[in-house]
């Protein structure tokens, strides 16, 4: 069993028993393919006696392998082991290897089952395995190549294929510059083409070929999957076309985008620095002449300037000796203002000085009778004649025609 074995060790296989599932230990040997043998995984039963109706050795052909994936935490395994899946066309095997060796077993099986392709381990069971994808080196370049091959394919339903209304069987052709899809109700009709420089990734497995189109394709971006037994041939044809296109492409330098400085330079401004740090004016720089100012209006002159001009005028008239005026900014700091008169109701009753209404008198009527008594001084009475002449009471001329007339004042 040791001749030509790529890897050997112990693996556990989960088997269905009468009363449930049970793990059994096997000696495992992994063999690569040759001209006289197929790549395979052999599980040899241990020294314990095999059960009846069970073969002592199990052989798993790696050419029938569809996927190899690590099992998640939902799959229980023996102590100090980790489980992984090995799916073939006939059945699904659940194997377990020592935790430190599971990665080596999975990688070795993948290299023999899918030669020449980089493997991407899928997630836990229940997630659909995706074909391993390879980056396209000509994505977004602009060169054409010349392979021309045709392959019969069947479209698998995906989001991109449903958007393009692609269903059924078609012919996939590797053209000179693009991957072309031919078919439809009329023969010889090209439905879509995907330029090689716009294909992001492409991959294949035993029964599937798929690629991811860029957004600049006519179909739009998305994944397209095809069922075909010629997946490896399509992959090699595409790889050959892209390699030839890459070798024929001239090495043109990519234009570098203009770099934007982190901080833009700012022109020097005299207001951005202190007054003491301003540089002296250059002798070669002409000094701009001051602009002539128009006649200022009356309200444009500050009040202190108006006060100074009025003070000069009044000084000449009143002959008052001139007084030094303080700076208008500080002229009211220490100025002594006269005290404001107190309000009449601010003083307590009986303390304030007597005013006009502090000595009321009782009104008396018939002022004409009281003021015309004989004890009054007749020298204070005056009469105004129509001619505008004034005479005192003692100088009246007796026996005149109008000595009886009394002038009365009308109401105001």
Curated annotation (Swiss-Prot):
Gene3D superfamilies: Pleckstrin-homology domain (PH domain)/Phosphotyrosine-binding domain (PTB). Pfam families: IRS. Keywords: Host-virus interaction, Phosphoprotein. Residues 147-252 form the IRS-type PTB domain. GO terms for molecular function: transmembrane receptor protein tyrosine kinase adaptor activity. GO terms for cellular component: cytoplasm; cytosol; plasma membrane. Residues 277-291 have a biased composition (Pro residues). The keyword Nucleotide-binding does not apply. Disulfide bonds: none annotated. InterPro entries: Docking_Protein_DOK (IPR050996), Dok1/2/3_PTB (IPR037751), IRS_PTB (IPR002404), PH-like_dom_sf (IPR011993), PH_domain (IPR001849). On immunoreceptor stimulation, phosphorylated on C-terminal tyrosine residues. Phosphorylation on Tyr-345 is required for binding to the SH2 domain of NCK. Phosphorylation on both Tyr-271 and Tyr-299 is required for interaction with RASGAP. Phosphorylated on tyrosine residues by TEK/TIE2. SMART domains: IRS, PH, PTBI. GO terms for biological process: cell surface receptor protein tyrosine kinase signaling pathway; cell surface receptor signaling pathway; Ras protein signal transduction; signal transduction. Residues 4-114 form the PH domain. The keyword Phosphoprotein applies. PROSITE patterns: IRS_PTB, PH_DOMAIN. Residues 246-296, 359-412 are annotated as: Disordered. PTB domain mediates receptor interaction. Belongs to the DOK family. Type A subfamily. This is Docking protein 2.
